Every structure is written in structure tokens, then in C-alpha cells.
Swiss-Prot record:
Top enzyme class: transferase
GO-annotated biological processes: DNA-templated transcription
Coarse class of the protein's main subcellular location: virion
EC number: 2.7.7.48
Keywords: Nucleotide-binding, Nucleotidyltransferase, RNA-binding, RNA-directed RNA polymerase, Transferase, Viral RNA replication, Virion
GO molecular function: nucleotide binding; RNA binding; RNA-directed RNA polymerase activity
Biological function: RNA-directed RNA polymerase that is involved in both transcription and genome replication.
InterPro entries: DNA/RNA_pol_sf, RNA-dir_pol_C
Catalysed reaction, written as an equation: RNA(n) + a ribonucleoside 5'-triphosphate = RNA(n+1) + diphosphate
Name under which the protein is recorded: Potential RNA-dependent RNA polymerase
Amino acid sequence: MQVAPNVWSKYFNIPNPGLRAYFSNVVSGQPEVYRTPFYKGMSLESICDEWYKKLVSIDTQWPTLMEFEDDLRKKVGPMSVMLPLKERMSDIDSYYDSISKDQVPFDTKAISAAKSEWKGVSRLRLRSEVNTVAVMKKSTNSGSPYFSKRKAVVSKTIPCDVYMDGRYCVMRQNGREWSGAAVLGWRGQEGGPKPTDVKQRVVWMFPFAVNIRELQVYQPLILTFQRLGLVPAWVSMEAVDRRITKMFDTKGPRDVVVCTDFSKFDQHFNPTCQSVAKELLADLLTGQEAVDWLERVFPIKYAIPLAYNWGEIRYGIHGMGSGSGGTNADETLVHRVLQHEAAISHHTTLNPNSQCLGDDGVLTYPGISAEDVMQSYSRHGLDMNLEKQYVSKQDCTYLRRWHHTDYRVDGMCVGVYSTMRALGRLAMQERYYDPDVWGEKMVTLRYLSIIENVKYHPLKEEFLDFCIKGDKTRLGLGIPGFLDNIAGEAQKAIDMMPDFLGYTKSLQYDGDLRRNAAAGIENWWVVQALKSRR
């Protein structure tokens, strides 16, 4: 809805030419397909065709890995095309409409089972605002009200207090009161070879102050779960591999593993799911400050207004706002309850080596079937498609990696990343990168962060050679001193390139570990393999 200028100025520090220009781009969209210099002059289809000639050799020994590669090849394509606002309104509507589907409460036994898993967590207390801000990424946008770099407005933001008052979000920042709103953002995801295939993702850019108050809980929570190994994906991909291996080694030989697939999990994260997330957090927290936080801060991510154009704001309760500091944690905790409930409804117990992260999950229990899992999950208003659930006794896909009970490295069922997906990421950009900032070192670091994912692929060495041929610097081999000083180069890159490590790896370096996020890059497989080719 349109709001009056005097109302708009309660949400944003006006004048703000950067914000006005931003919304102008949101309205018009972005039609360009941004390519990298990788295999310059060749189409992405031609690059994939050339690599496929080598890739097909895995089909005989690992047919399900070949199927995994073939499936992801269909989705390889542009990522940078943003539709105009008018063509994205239905995606925004979905956040408000999808939470109203029929839903029943969760089984209390399933909630208790999840709580029992986490009983080793000491009663958590809130972090101070100062300590929370110290380990937050401050190179990103601050959102409402200043809409500038976070690092430029820290002193204007803390101390802060935030809470919902009816349909409004109140933000008190360093003695000044504002109304809070998320700003409509965008993320593109490959969906196929044509520009029209780009999947349009709604991003909720949360106010800096709201994120600070949220992360006072979620930072220590994730850190504690990391220390106890409760969510392997928050620890490392190696921890994920170990748990997948245990799952295959402990499940019944006739029992399948179900890899679950939700449609629009954020949008369908309804009041039933939200209340369970709150109950689970209440069980992990202690003290009056935590009680106040649960009443004042926790609900914001499900009710914060959305500024989607200059002078236009949408109000009302909705699904999960993606830019919240608690998006991944709330969804992961609730997803674990869903997994327990599926097993309990079948009168059995979940294999404890089942896993989930956000909407991504893999589970097994005696007598499991995809139909039973889907029926159990859908009771709570969540949307699933039976044809998209992957079922197998021997292999699974989790966090975009293929695992097989017989494909092991040092005894571990390691996760294999698709080389086809990697090619798409190497050739296509998510957004425009300023060439004055993105020199050849930054481009090469981005390439290496993508190629490192394939370190367990049976054709990893052949793939690396293929990639070297497609890059004018030969992946840094042609840049004097680059590989020898790669740790220093990576540290410089992280603030400039927020997704340099990838989303999952960023979660693994959350909290106190973020400052060491580049540590160990010199030991990456791809770096060592390149050095051996000098």
C-alpha cells in the first residue's frame, strides 16, 4: 500500500538517493545475462557438451551419480536476470497467502524427541549487543532506516530495542525511534538454459537493529550446537559426511533413505511452525532477558512490514523472512521435529543419523516410505510434491551433494558435488561485478571456491584440467605469487565477496569463528592440486 511521505520518513532516513535508485532498479528489473571470462567466446551449452564427453565415463560404475549430473545439467543457465516488480508481486503474495493452508498442531511426542536430542545444550543466555555486532558481517547493507553500509552506522544503531506493536515494528536506536521494515531484495537461481528460466527468489533485507537483537540468541545457539555436533551442517561438510556414513551403516538393508523436497518452505512456514520454533527456543534459553526476547524479538521475522517500492509498504503476518538472523535456525529446529514426527506416526523411531538444514533433509527409519513422510509433513500446511522426493536404499542427495553407501574415501561416504552445476557457476554470474574491484585475483578466487566443491568427484583431476584450459590465468598459475599468498588474498576478498565461501560454509563460520573464515584455504584440494601442476 502507498504510504504518505511523513509516514515513509519514519521508516527511512530521508533524503536517501541510494534507496531511491535501488527501488528504481527493483521496479524496472534487470534483463542482462552476466557471463564470466571462463571459456570466453563459448556458449555455456558448448562448454557443457565438451565436458560431457569425459563425464559420461562414470555412467557404468556410478549410474546414479550420472543421473545426478544429468538432472543438474538441465538446470544450468543464467542467474542474473531479475524480473520487473510487477511480475514478482505474486511471489510476494505467496508469503502472505501460503501460511493459511490447513494445518494441525505438531505431535508433542515429536517435540519432546527433538528436545531430548538437544538436552546437552546448557541453558543459553543472550549475548551482549556489542559482542554480537563484533562478529557480524558489516560490509552488507544496513536496511531500514539508513540503507547504507552497516559499518558506517554502527554508532547510530546501538544500543537498540526492537519489538512489534500491532502491525508495526518499533525500533529504538541510540535514543532515536524509527519504524522498521524489511526491504525487498532479490536473488536469482539457475533454472534452465534460457534467461526466462531464472528462478526468482524474494529476499527480505532486514534492518541492522533487528538482526543484532535476533543474533543475540542465534549466535550463541549455533555456536553451542557446533561444539556439540548437533547439526553437522553447522560444523563442516566433513561432519555431514560422517553422519551420512553412519546413517547408511546403521539403517536396515531394506530400508530406503528419503531425501525430502519442499515447495516454498519459507512461504509456508506458518503459525503452527512458528509456535513450535518458539517452544523449542524457550527450552534452550534461560533468564528473564530470554523470556522478554521471545515475546518481543522472536515474532518480528514473521510480521515485519515489507517495503517493496519507494513509498509503498505491505503489512501483515507472513511466512519466514529470509533476511532474519534466525531463518536457518528456526527452520532447522522445526524440520527436525518433522523428521521425528514422521517416524513416530509410523510407530517407530527416527534413525538419529538423519539430518536437516533449513528446508533440506535426509531421513530414514524402519519401514519408511516417501508417501508416509510426505503425508506426515503436509498435515502442517507444508507443500510437497511426491515426484520430487528422492528415494533409494543406496544413495542420497543432501546439500546439493550425492552420497552413495559404496562410494567412500577413507571409509567415509563423501559428498560429491555436480561438475555440471560447477560449470554453470563458473560461467555465469549472480550479479554485475565492478571490474575496478574485481581484478583477476578476485575472479580466480571465485573460480577456486566453486571448483573446491568437486574435491570428491571421481573425475576431479580431469575436471580441474578442463577448467585450467578455460581460464586465461590458468586458475592463478599465471599470476606471479598468487598461489603462495592465497590465504592473504582470500582474507581480503571475503568482505568484498559475501558469498565467496558459499552459503553453507558461511553458516559453519558463524559467530566467533567468522574472523577466521579464510583460514585453511591454502590447504584446499584445488590449491594443492594447482601447485602440483606448476
